[in-house]
Amino acid sequence: MAKQLRPMSALASTATSYPTTHEKIEKPTDTPYFVDNEFRPSQTDKFIELHDPATNNLVTRVPQLTNAELQAAVDSAQRAFPEWKAKSVLARQQIMFKYVSLIRENWDRLAASITLEQGKTFVDARGDVLRGLQVAEAACGAPEYLKGEVLEVAKDMETRSYREPLGVVAAICPFNFPAMIPLWCIPIATVTGNTVVLKPSERDPGAAMILVELAKEAGFPEGVVNVVHGAHDTVNFLLDAPEIKAISFVGGNKAGEYIFSRGSANGKRVQANLGAKNHAAVMPDCNKNQFLNAIVGAAFGAAGQRCMALSTLVMVGETKEWLIELAESAKKLQVNGGFEEGADLGPVITPQSKARIESLIASAEEEGATILLDGRGFKPEKYPNGNWVGPTIITNVTKDMKCYKEEIFGPVLVCLNVDTLDEAIDLINQNEYGNGTAIFTRSGATAETFRRNIEAGQVGINVPIPVPLPMFSFTGNKKSVAGGGANTFYGRPGIVFYTQQKTVTALWSSADAISQKADVAMPTHS
């Protein structure tokens, strides 16, 4: 039997206990849902099998909840909202402090669930948890963001503004960050006074189940945080439920544009981060060793399954000669099961993802690109049945090739050649995506030219994955975000998304009204 991190409580989620090896689980149990602070088995007859990506052994079955079960979660959140809203922000903050502490205490348990279900290396999975934890820590400072404004606008008259919660909100989360994305949503939504219905990815819900277990332990009342499961039917239910006032989504463009359109049509606020094709411009004056190390990590970490993975290089001038060295560095990466010591990257999420990635590599070959490093057909000796794609570098790519136009979402780096910085900027700006970009250079003037003219929402100067820390906000643009990027995640904009503004103007006159005639002209208070 696999080693267990913690004994399983009879009343707890299956997610409270996770192996730290990829050994076969002899008796997998079904994943429950979470309503009214309790784990409940679904009564559905429809389940989605979840397999360890390193072995394709069955880990659990995830239920497609019935409509009655979905409605129970929404009703729970709706019932909890008035009392939760009425709690002082300091009381909610104290619960958040406890929640942060519990996440830290259960860091390895959360990471183990991610490695088993999603495939990330254990070290990378710990980073997934940490980046979400940082948002939860920042949410503890919400009272500062929630402070309103006041102005004496005229004699005996003042105007005050308040930020108030929306009500029930929902989060639809992707497979690639099973802890981080739920933690982009739960802390900010709840500390501002909302209640939450969370749908983790059906491919790896375990981390979310641990997070709600910890939320209960931290002191969140019944109904404040609920978890539902399923695929399209669950998404549609959440989009249509009139009780839900806002939807948060991270994922691909097809799903995200659908969610934004249907959610908006139903009168909901929607924040939706979508796909990406993140470029880096490489200048001849850059620190070559720094560039080589940074790109190997940014392109191939998490098997390339990051919305901010640096998947495209724009080699300026002579830098194209460095790609041989880049391939040599990438060859040294250890591709293995995520629990194995020394593993640098694990498998991709499903056999279907592997097939799609390999087909895009093949298309590049057919269209005349060069496969400088080919990760197809790779199999670690210990795990021959996993969804393996090794690091792959494709050179001599042109922008009309399929491998360039599509988001590959795997450990594949495509490389294009240009002669000048201006050409690099033009090429990057012509791409329809705008999540992030980077430039590698020693020149401040070059960096400033790039910063000023580039059209991506998050820019790194010698930083390959410029995801902002939680005191800022995640600011993709163009087709990488729905709705023009108005509703962004975390930071002050995250607080704004989960709250609505109320403005109150009050007149407190010490003198009695002496006029006998009403004034029907537009009041100007001047």
Please report, for each region that a protein language model flagged, where it lies by residue:
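Structural signal for hydrophobic packing residues in well-ordered secondary-structure cores
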Residues: 81, 85, 100-107, 111, ...
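Hydrophobic face of amphipathic alpha-helices that form TPR/SEL1-like repeat modules
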Residues: 5-54
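Residue-level signal for inorganic ion chemistry
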Residues: 56, 92, 114, 136, ...
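Conserved C-terminal structural/oligomerization subdomain of aldehyde/semialdehyde dehydrogenase
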Residues: 3, 8, 57-61, 244, ...
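Short, well-ordered beta-strand elements within core beta-sheets of diverse protein domains
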Residues: 59-65, 80-86, 171, 280-283, ...
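Glycine-rich loop-to-alpha-helix module at the N-terminal edge of alpha/beta enzyme cores
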Residues: 57-146, 156
